[in-house]
Amino acid sequence: MTENKTVLYSYWRSSCSWRVRVALAYKKIKYEYKAIHLLKDGGQQKSDEYSKLNPMKAIPTLEIDGHIIGQSLAILEYLEETHPENPLMPKGSYERAIARQMMQIIGSDIQPLQNLKVLGLIAQYSGDDSKKSEWARTVITNGFNGLEKLLEKHSGKFCVGDSVSFADLCLPAQVYNANRFNVDMTPYPNITRVNQHLLTIPEFIEALPQNQPDAEPQC
């Protein structure tokens, strides 16, 4: 670990890394990008060297302020607490709770159930590679059904009112995944509307997969 140097271990298409990239952009924190390819060499996150940084062998990992932090949602909380400038949460306690509720729907109920590791297990135990997309669509649809209702009640320009929150940092990557797995977005007008707004904001554009140094041509 390099003292006083911020380093993000990331993969261009990783949903969890994407959230952190947006946060770092909003907080105006300069960092070094170190690519960890999730497929090459059997998964570079499984290497002995990287495992010393992150015992879960997952990304992202952030080196910052002399510390090493894994898990994207924990990283977001740390950045908000230690770098209060350009806040990423609403002021009101209730609004903050709703933002965290939305964040957890994506970060706990949807994305982990359709990530690369889980889809690999689906194919392995079913013996049918085509089941991966079917499973992902089911998981995303179930989660979006609940998220859409919350956005109908609480959203403005952003997921919660008219200011950015952790929920917004999680949304674009999940919509990206929904599109990858051909989820019908017609039933989700509020998710679509908020996501379209987010993708006009410079910090969100900077964090897009295709704008990362390790982006691959098929993006």
From Swiss-Prot:
EC code: 5.2.1.2
Pfam family, one: GST_C_3
Family annotation (InterPro entries): Glutathione-S-Trfase_C-like (IPR010987), Glutathione-S-Trfase_C_sf (IPR036282), Glutathione_S-Trfase (IPR040079), Glutathione_S-Trfase_N (IPR004045), GST_C (IPR004046), GST_Zeta (IPR005955), GST_Zeta_C (IPR034330), GST_Zeta_N (IPR034333)
Required cofactor(s): glutathione
Keywords: Isomerase, Phenylalanine catabolism, Transferase, Tyrosine catabolism
Catalyzed chemical reaction(s): 4-maleylacetoacetate = 4-fumarylacetoacetate
Top enzyme class: isomerase
GO molecular function: glutathione transferase activity; maleylacetoacetate isomerase activity
Cited PROSITE patterns: GST_CTER, GST_NTER
Entry keyword Manganese: no
Domain (GST N-terminal): residue spans on this chain: 4-87
Gene Ontology cellular component list: mitochondrion
Family: Belongs to the GST superfamily. Zeta family.
Official protein name in the record: Maleylacetoacetate isomerase
Native species: Dictyostelium discoideum (Social amoeba)
